[in-house]
């Protein structure tokens, strides 16, 4: 078997900025009466007959076990005193662009991963600041002073560890992992916290008695590749803190979609939803093959009179999981106004795409 040298570039200074419960935080900033209340971004199930899904929620709501992609009905059952807000996504995008302008004051090497998070390479920066920690603190300060929003920051020598670090002390946290500290940091981390390891994969790793980074470190590269395919190669390196992926500004935003036109109009709701599921499956399979994950799910419905409706849902975390795409596509469809005319076309699209590296995915799809 070919073996490649483990080249680890520790000279870079990478920051990962992740806004804290961004959509909910913007709503709380704009409406001070929401302070200290559980806030859920999603349709109120009391107004939709139980339909709807949670886009995100604030930390107060998370205390009740509410999380993104949960049905609004279950969220209400867990937290009946929550304030449900349908969400103003165009406003969130505007605020997201304001945040990016702050990033650009420090470096042009900014790689947005979504509307509320980005990687920054500040190895060399516009202000000539040698300390990446100081840059991260200044960015946190600027975002608070200008926008009255908090973010968490991770600072390290690569994107993988910087992302893990930004999740370590939320909200409004700053975690620094130096090259000489990376191995101990990763050893203590539960394997489920490694970005790129989905729930099913965690189960498979647990079956191998791999529960932490320290456990993963003991497994040979050959064993990991044999069990997980190409991704085993990446796991072996990440366990050692090796990830030389560059910060890529101006990343091309693409979408993955599937739509079908029906010669025979669809009238029956069961038939329509069965076709939605087929589209969702094709999208998930295409995303997994392309090694992409997305945060926005869009459905498109064209009726017999050629009128067309599109509706989208933005998730708190990116996905390529079929069950998630299927469930949310159905939830979005349920929110459309009833139309008795037949359906001529159905489409499902996953957009807001990014590379699966550093994100949640299912290793079963890579074996």
UniProtKB/Swiss-Prot annotation:
Pfam families per the UniProt record, alphabetical: IMS, IMS_C, IMS_HHH
Keyword set, alphabetical order: Cytoplasm, DNA damage, DNA repair, DNA replication, DNA-binding, DNA-directed DNA polymerase, Magnesium, Metal-binding, Mutator protein, Nucleotidyltransferase, Transferase
Disulfide bonds: none
Co-factor(s): Mg(2+)
Catalytic activity: DNA(n) + a 2'-deoxyribonucleoside 5'-triphosphate = DNA(n+1) + diphosphate
InterPro entries in the record: DNA/RNA_pol_sf (IPR043502), DNA_pol_Y-fam_lit_finger_sf (IPR036775), DNA_pol_Y-fam_little_finger (IPR017961), DNA_polymerase-Y (IPR050116), DNApol_IV (IPR022880), PolY_HhH_motif (IPR024728), Rev_trsase/Diguanyl_cyclase (IPR043128), UmuC (IPR001126)
Gene Ontology CC annotations of this record: cytosol
PANTHER family linked to this entry: DNA POLYMERASE KAPPA, DNA REPAIR POLYMERASE UMUC / TRANSFERASE FAMILY MEMBER
Annotated function: Poorly processive, error-prone DNA polymerase involved in untargeted mutagenesis. Copies undamaged DNA at stalled replication forks, which arise in vivo from mismatched or misaligned primer ends. These misaligned primers can be extended by PolIV. Exhibits no 3'-5' exonuclease (proofreading) activity. May be involved in translesional synthesis, in conjunction with the beta clamp from PolIII.
Protein name according to UniProt: DNA polymerase IV
Species whose genome carries this gene: Streptococcus thermophilus (strain ATCC BAA-250 / LMG 18311)
Lineage: Bacteria, Bacillati, Bacillota, Bacilli, Lactobacillales
């Amino acid at each position: 078997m070919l073996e490649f040298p483990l080249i680890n570039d520790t000279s870079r200074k990478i920051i990962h900025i992740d806004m804290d419960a961004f959509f909910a935080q913007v709503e709380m900033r704009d409406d001070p009466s929401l302070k200290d209340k559980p806030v859920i971004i999603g349709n109120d199930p009391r107004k939709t007959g139980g339909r709807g899904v949670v886009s995100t929620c604030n930390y107060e709501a998370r205390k009740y076990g509410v999380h993104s992609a949960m049905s609004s009905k279950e969220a209400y059952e867990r937290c009946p005193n929550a304030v449900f807000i349908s969400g103003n996504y165009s406003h969130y995008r505007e605020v997201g662009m304001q945040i990016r302008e702050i990033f650009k004051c420090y470096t042009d090497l900014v790689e947005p991963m979504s509307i509320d998070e980005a990687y920054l390479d500040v190895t060399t920066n516009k202000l000539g600041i040698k300390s990446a920690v100081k840059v991260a603190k200044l960015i946190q300060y600027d975002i608070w002073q200008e926008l009255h929003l908090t973010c968490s920051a991770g600072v390290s020598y690569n994107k993988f560890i910087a992302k893990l670090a930004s999740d370590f002390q939320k909200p409004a946290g700053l975690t620094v992992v130096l090259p000489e500290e990376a191995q101990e940091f990763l050893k203590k981390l539960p394997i489920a916290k490694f970005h790129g390891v989905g729930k099913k994969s965690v189960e498979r790793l647990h079956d191998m008695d791999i529960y932490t980074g320290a456990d993963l470190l003991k497994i040979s590269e050959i064993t990991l590749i044999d069990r997980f395919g190409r991704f085993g190669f990446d796991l072996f390196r990440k366990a050692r803190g090796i990830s030389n992926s560059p910060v890529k500004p101006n990343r091309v935003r693409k979408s993955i979609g599937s739509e079908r036109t029906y010669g025979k109009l669809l009238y029956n709701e069961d038939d329509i939803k069965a076709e939605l599921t087929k589209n969702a499956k094709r999208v998930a399979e295409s995303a997994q093959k392309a090694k992409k994950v997305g945060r926005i799910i869009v459905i498109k419905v064209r009726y017999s009179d050629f009128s067309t409706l599109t509706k989208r849902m933005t998730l708190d975390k990116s996905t390529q999981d079929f069950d998630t795409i299927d469930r949310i596509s159905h939830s979005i469809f349920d929110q459309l106004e009833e139309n008795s005319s037949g359906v001529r076309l159905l489409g499902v699209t996953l957009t807001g795409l990014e590379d699966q590296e550093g994100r949640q995915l299912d290793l079963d799809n890579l074996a």
